[in-house]
């Protein structure tokens, strides 16, 4: 047992003052508060740190020389987190995250926290909690070797404005609830729940990390009194130091839920004191755009009396699991990781750090020698070393599934050209060029879109593909290489070519075949629109076949370079189902206009499939003025040629899809419900003939979209750092008692 006297404890003192005002729309009641002085992390009566964990016999000890530094993942005042590769032993080649802390920079309380973090990680084994593989120390530093989680942290995702719909939040909160419950069952209060401490693995599941502020051995009938955690996420009983139990974590879960759903914190004043007073007394303004179930859960988590808080009762987490907000969650499947996460990081190189903050990953990884600590520091960390007992067994029995051959061949600094061989051009645009490429190791063929970042910000396109590319009819993003001026997006190769090419090459084509094609495309567009995504460039050249089968299932919607995601006033993503009170009317109008443009493009495609020529251009030599005049008139022919043989039902659908007024145009949902689509198996099998040469039809189609592109300038897609949310959270250092 190692003991510390009061003289060894650091005490940065402050007072909680009485405030009577209205801040950010929150009314603060004029009630006197007890003035107290306390340390940022006053451990109170907890003066002894038990050392009960030891290195398991027979396991190999680790040291810094066994790990190759690859990249910097994060940095604080006490040290850094590196991406490393194990160089020797049964797990050679395995990637880990290495947390390096400088002993000399750690005050006594911080050393206690670090030892506590190591002890907790040794004890914990849970699918949603980060795993500790090794722990060791040198004279000047402490090392924790942890899981490397390629998805980055939720804070980075939030600051990039990806997520969060209520369905997304429901999934992440459910996994967090299981992780917190596991800690509570071990007598551990987490006490520092915030987006920065929630990581995403390569499949998109969460992993809770950073246990430096957690408190062990707190039973339900006992309380801790230390003032630890990030202020904005603190429960009232932590702020007023009247003692707290595991129930404090459920308040923090509510804060996290509120922030993920709204992009703002529920209690945040102009300074630390005001924030704490708001936590203690301010009334919470409940956003009305949230569902009743979400509002209900927030109210039950934001109970200032911890004994009344959801999860504090004798049933614990079961109270939370039974809440109607989680009614669609299968908790057993969730625990077994059988439910599909709402977001999956782009798959690619095992050491890919695209999801991490470039502020850190751009730095050269260097682990400088640590300054020797004070004389008693080594005694403090006695028993710190650890090797996970399962590390050796796992490495013997299981292949390193997350290590691709490319890592072993090319190492950590592999560039696109190290991994892929460029071949011929596939397509050339204003901001990018698309080429075929071959993986140098597997010889598999892919396509790569090379984007000039000086001409266009690719962030939105990458985020959309990462988020929605798992849909079977949306092109799949395989890898991302960010190399200075250019970004390389590696995708599956569309070997079947353009949809229109394939159709026009067929001598005969029936309504039934056309309806099957339109159904597949419209179903995909409807999925995107329901998620608040508009493509805005659905010309036929962006709809391709994955293979030569001609099967509608192999159709892929490609090129999301001009796609947009619906965002609220705070910059967060939304779905159209709950935006009325959260988005400016002109934004909704613009979104509706863009969605209507997507349907218009599908109408042009349908017209061309049935007629064999385009509706508004007679040939590739038509001028933009002529084409725009015809489009603006809203008139197109539905008589003569194939139209004399085409069903009235198809003509009715076309007239609604090509309606000149976007407000009267069909939505994707309405297209799918139209009888020509809903009863497509009953459509005529009559073979429609082709009269015009395919190259003339394609030329006319290109002229149509060229005219449209000249009519309106494409919007400039600014970096996400310019958004209101990114600016609001730009500091990357929420006021924290941890000071790190």
Curated annotation (Swiss-Prot):
Q: Which family does it belong to?
A: Belongs to the protein kinase superfamily. AGC Ser/Thr protein kinase family. S6 kinase subfamily.
Classification of source organism: Eukaryota, Metazoa, Chordata, Craniata, Vertebrata
Q: What does this protein do?
A: Serine/threonine kinase that may play a role in mediating the growth-factor and stress induced activation of the transcription factor CREB.
The catalytic activity, as recorded, is: L-seryl-[protein] + ATP = O-phospho-L-seryl-[protein] + ADP + H(+); L-threonyl-[protein] + ATP = O-phospho-L-threonyl-[protein] + ADP + H(+)
Q: How is its activity regulated?
A: Activated by multiple phosphorylations on threonine and serine residues.
What GO cellular-component annotations does this UniProt entry give? cytoplasm; nucleoplasm
Q: Where are the transmembrane segments?
A: none
Domain of life the protein comes from: Eukaryota
The organism named in the record is Danio rerio (Zebrafish)
Q: What Pfam families would the database entry show?
A: Pkinase (PF00069), Pkinase_C (PF00433)
Q: What residue stretches are annotated with the AGC-kinase C-terminal domain?
A: 327-396
User: What cofactor requirement does the entry state?
Assistant: Mg(2+)
Q: Which residues form the active site?
A: 192, 537
Q: What is this protein called?
A: Ribosomal protein S6 kinase alpha-6
For this protein, what is the EC number? Answer: 2.7.11.1
Picking any one GO molecular function of the record gives: magnesium ion binding
| Gene that this polypeptide is encoded by | rps6ka6
Q: How does it assemble?
A: Forms a complex with either ERK1 or ERK2 in quiescent cells. Transiently dissociates following mitogenic stimulation.
Q: Name one GO biological process term.
A: DNA damage response, signal transduction by p53 class mediator
Provide this UniProt record's keywords sorted from A to Z.
ATP-binding, Kinase, Magnesium, Metal-binding, Nucleotide-binding, Phosphoprotein, Repeat, Serine/threonine-protein kinase, Transferase
Residues in Protein kinase domain copies: 67-326, 420-677
The entry's ATP-binding residues are: 73-81, 99, 426-434, 449
